[in-house]
Structure formats: structure tokens, C-alpha cells
Swiss-Prot record:
Sample GO molecular function, one term: ornithine decarboxylase inhibitor activity
Quaternary data: Part of the 30S ribosomal subunit.
Region (Disordered): 1-26
Protein name: Small ribosomal subunit protein bS20
GO CC field: cytoplasm; cytosol; cytosolic small ribosomal subunit; small ribosomal subunit
GO annotation terms (biological process): cytoplasmic translation; ribosomal small subunit assembly
Biological role: Binds directly to 16S ribosomal RNA.
Gene label: rpsT
Gene3D superfamilies: Ribosomal protein S20
Similarity annotation: Belongs to the bacterial ribosomal protein bS20 family.
The entry's keywords: Ribonucleoprotein, Ribosomal protein, RNA-binding, rRNA-binding
PANTHER family: 30S RIBOSOMAL PROTEIN S20, SMALL RIBOSOMAL SUBUNIT PROTEIN BS20C
InterPro entries in the record: Ribosomal_bS20, Ribosomal_bS20_sf
Length: 87
């Protein structure tokens, strides 16, 4: 454990940020899973609706640095391609 006051404070802040980031990451993954579930079900309308809900969430997390911008772009591109493949 840290002995210096500033190091103790950083440890507390770091733990708080870790919990906050974990919550945001979990939320983002849930939205992505909803899109995959709709694609698996073969429901294009539901998949498109879920994608439209997921897109701003993923973009926001990328802008805040929670995930890399390329990862956000990759998720969106892959899901868009799969949705377009549905008849």
C-alpha cells in the first residue's frame, strides 16, 4: 500500500475510475450483444433498431478513450456488413 499522501489519493481515484470504466464497458458490450442477437434471429428491422441505439454509445466511449477509435469503427463496420447481409 502507498505511504505517500498523493499516492494514496491516486490509488483511491484509480479504483473509482476502474469501477466507472467497467460499468461503461459492460453497458457498451450489452448494446453490442443486442445487435448480434437480432442478427442471429434473422430480424433485420430489430437488428437495425438495435444498431441505431448502439452506435452513439460506442462512439461516445471511443471519444472518451474507453476504447480505441479503430475498435469502435471495426464494431460498426462488421455489424453493418452483417445487417446488410440479412435479406
Amino acid at each position: 500500500m502507498a505511504n505517500i499522501k498523493s499516492a494514496k489519493k491516486r490509488a483511491i481515484q484509480s479504483e473509482k475510475a476502474r469501477k466507472h470504466n467497467a460499468s461503461r464497458r459492460s453497458m457498451m458490450r450489452t448494446f453490442i450483444k443486442k445487435v448480434y442477437a437480432a442478427i442471429e434471429a434473422g430480424d433485420k428491422a430489430a437488428a437495425q433498431k438495435a444498431f441505431n441505439e448502439m452506435q452513439p454509445i460506442v462512439d461516445r466511449q471511443a471519444a472518451k478513450g474507453l476504447i480505441h477509435k479503430n475498435k469502435a469503427a471495426r464494431h460498426k463496420a462488421n455489424l453493418t456488413a452483417q445487417i446488410n447481409k440479412l435479406a
